[in-house]
């Protein structure tokens, strides 16, 4: 059991429960590159560790509910594939913005940030910024993705922007629920001149 039924996607009410080993087995049956497979597994392990701590149990006893559903596995695997295809060397995430208040999950009403998000951001030293927006802006899956790929918190002094992408969440808030990512190339002598970089800004993931 976990808090992942607050995931921003719409799911049916019935999902099977899968352990980490079962999810690993599903990922291994796909035709992913070695790097994409490792990243997908890393994201799920971060989630499992956070849920294990939240429930005071061992990681082997964690069974995913919503995050174990096929569509959520596809979400994480798709991210891993796209990330691998971009050949990104460094990821800059200064912090992520979170909402306030409470949410309802299978365990009842719990405060925002939910325990799994707190555990991930604490374990990986990810800075959270509070907003006045009522609701959950950061899901455990989103926090796990940031934890899995972030390498730095501050941009290089000199860089050029190659591409910019936006992803909009389905929930309606006072401010746009948008994730922005920039693919940049560093002009710093300390980094490979041809290194592709990504910089994540806003968050509703």
Question: Which residue stretches match the model-derived regions?
Answer:
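Mobile "lid/hinge" segments at catalytic clefts and subdomain interfaces of large enzymes
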Residues: 88-204
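Short acidic, glycine/Ser/Thr-rich loop/turn "cap" segments at secondary-structure junctions
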Residues: 27-34, 59-67
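Short glycine-rich or small-residue beta-strand-to-loop segments that form or flank ligand, phosphate
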Residues: 63-68, 200-204
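ATP-dependent carbohydrate kinase catalytic cores
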Residues: 52, 72, 95
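Short, hydrophobic/aliphatic alpha-helical segments
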Residues: 48-62, 87, 91, 127
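Glycine-rich nucleotide/cofactor/substrate-binding loop typically near the N-terminus or early
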Residues: 1-54, 114, 123-126, 133-134, ...
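Conserved phosphate/anionic-ligand binding catalytic regions in large, soluble enzymes, centered on
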Residues: 64-87
């Amino acid at each position: 059991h976990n808090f992942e039924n607050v995931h921003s996607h719409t799911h049916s009410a019935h999902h099977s429960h899968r352990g980490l080993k079962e999810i690993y087995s599903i990922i291994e049956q796909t035709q992913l590159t070695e790097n994409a497979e490792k990243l997908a597994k890393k994201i799920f392990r971060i989630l499992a560790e956070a849920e294990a701590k939240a429930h005071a149990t061992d990681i082997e006893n964690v069974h995913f509910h919503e995050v174990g559903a096929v569509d959520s596995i596809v979400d994480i695997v798709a991210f891993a594939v796209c990330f691998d295809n971009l050949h990104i060397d460094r990821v800059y995430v200064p912090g992520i913005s979170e909402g306030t208040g409470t949410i309802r999950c299978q365990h009842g009403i719990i405060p925002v940030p939910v325990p799994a998000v707190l555990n991930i951001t604490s374990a990986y030293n990810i800075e959270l910024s509070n907003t006045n927006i009522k609701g959950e802006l950061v899901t455990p899956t989103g926090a796990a993705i940031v934890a899995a790929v972030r390498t730095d918190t501050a941009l290089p002094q000199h860089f050029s922007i190659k591409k910019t992408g936006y992803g909009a969440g389905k929930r309606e808030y006072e401010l746009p629920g948008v994730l922005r990512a920039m693919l940049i190339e560093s002009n710093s002598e300390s980094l490979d001149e041809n290194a592709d970089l990504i910089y994540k800004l806003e968050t509703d993931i």
